[in-house]
Swiss-Prot record:
Its main location: cytoplasm. Transmembrane segments: none annotated. The gene is zapA. SUPFAM superfamilies: Cell division protein ZapA-like (SSF102829). Keywords: Cell cycle, Cell division, Coiled coil, Cytoplasm, Septation. Activator of cell division through the inhibition of FtsZ GTPase activity, therefore promoting FtsZ assembly into bundles of protofilaments necessary for the formation of the division Z ring. It is recruited early at mid-cell but it is not essential for cell division. Pfam families: ZapA. HAMAP family: ZapA_type2 (MF_02013). This is Cell division protein ZapA.
Amino acid sequence: MSQQKGKKSRINVEIYGQQYSVVGDESTSHIRMVAAIVDDKMRELNAKNPSLDTSRLAVLTAVNVIHDYIKLKEEHEKLKESMRQKGME
């Protein structure tokens, strides 16, 4: 859920052992959740690819997250189309 228009949240988060100051339109709890998911994904991928440096690990994480996003978006579109065909929308 977005905060009031124009109101930004600023929060410090830790991702893969590094501190980042993040500013966003969402609540601080949402920003913390996003940071935790990124951290978890990086650690998961590092466990499978321990020889990757942090930069390559970050790129691999981004590729994996975008892959998941695209698959979910495609699934969402299929469900919307199915609902449209059934007259449920």
